[in-house]
């Protein structure tokens, strides 16, 4: 009997992944279904407009691989349009601040999305179930609308000032210019319509992942962004591909930790573990105050190095001929 776990911040998304496994899907099928479901249930941190990387362990082959689908800057982006103004950005990451935060929100902040290409590559390599079946839960849930609970209100309220700047964002996430909130009644349910997202997911399910980069979806995305003043083009979308990478192998206390390489958190994790291995002796029991202090010092030191030194080489990732634009 197969015993498996699916972890997600959203309980419903985890259930979708578990349902895919119960239907005979590979763990990668569950990842794909979970990814697109999260884009509906938690659109503030997930979705087809983002990017990332995944570390996969294939037990039968005893092989670890990384699928890299990090975002890339549009080819027409001009660095001079993003002057630094001093201080730290207002974003979660303390990068150097850019004038008007134009790298954080608005049409000028939009890179070439990688999530769909990443799921496409994972599906091509390992999936058992049809693409459209894995997207069906996200289509259904988008049709139900975004459930407004305290977490929804908190997340939207934290970005409401920026959402109000852009009509499309305000229409999707605000009610009369204000964040939505749940009603006081214990049985009352408030939902935000997600009709446009449902139509997008249905198109993506029916037409396949390349439609996002080369078809009707690609043209719609590029047209909307360019009309708003952004640089993303259909050419940028058509050129995007996810890539298979060798994992970063991090030796740690006699074992090996596998992580994502290059412009991800993997190198920072490697530096953190390297510092810890030197600064902290293995504990006989649980971590104590000395251990927690060592964790904090190693993380802070590694992150300072990340902010100071990590980035593209001459504006391009050193990946060979495929590197056609700076990565994000």
PLM regions and their residue ranges:
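Stable alpha-helical structural segments in soluble proteins, enriched in small hydrophobic residues
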Residues: 34, 118, 122, 275, ...
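Noncatalytic scaffold domains of N-terminal-nucleophile
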Residues: 1-15, 19, 27-207, 212-214, ...
């Amino acid at each position: 009997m197969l015993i498996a776990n699916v972890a997600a911040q959203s309980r419903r998304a985890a259930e979708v992944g578990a349902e895919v496994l119960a239907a005979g899907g590979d763990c990668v099928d569950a990842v794909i279904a979970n990814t697109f479901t999260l884009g509906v249930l938690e659109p503030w941190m997930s979705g087809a407009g983002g990017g990332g990387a995944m570390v996969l362990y294939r037990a039968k082959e005893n092989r670890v691989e990384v699928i890299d689908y990090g975002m890339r800057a549009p080819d027409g982006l001009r660095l001079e349009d993003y002057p630094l103004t001093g201080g730290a950005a207002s974003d979660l990451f303390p990068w150097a601040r850019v004038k008007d935060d134009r790298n954080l929100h608005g049409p000028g902040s939009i890179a070439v999305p990688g999530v769909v290409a990443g799921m496409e590559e994972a599906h091509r390599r390992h999936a058992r179930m049809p693409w459209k079946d894995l997207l069906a839960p996200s289509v259904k849930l988008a049709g139900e609308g975004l459930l407004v609970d305290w977490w929804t209100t908190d997340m939207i309220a934290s970005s409401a000032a920026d959402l109000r700047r852009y009509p499309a964002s305000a229409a999707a996430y605000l009610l009369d210019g204000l964040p939505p909130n749940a009603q006081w009644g214990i049985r009352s349910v408030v939902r935000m319509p997600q009709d446009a997202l449902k139509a997008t997911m249905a198109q993506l399910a029916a037409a396949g992942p390349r439609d996002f980069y080369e078809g009707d979806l690609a043209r719609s995305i590029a047209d909307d962004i360019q009309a708003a003043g952004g640089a993303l083009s259909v050419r940028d979308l058509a050129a995007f591909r996810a890539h298979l990478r060798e994992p970063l192998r991090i030796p740690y206390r006699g074992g090996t930790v596998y992580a994502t390489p290059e412009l991800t958190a993997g190198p920072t994790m490697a530096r953190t573990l390297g510092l810890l291995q030197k600064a902290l002796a293995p504990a006989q029991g649980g971590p104590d105050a000395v251990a927690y202090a060592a964790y904090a010092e190693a993380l802070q030191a590694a992150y300072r190095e990340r902010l100071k030194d990590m980035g593209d080489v001459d504006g391009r990732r050193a990946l060979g001929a495929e590197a056609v634009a700076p990565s994000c």
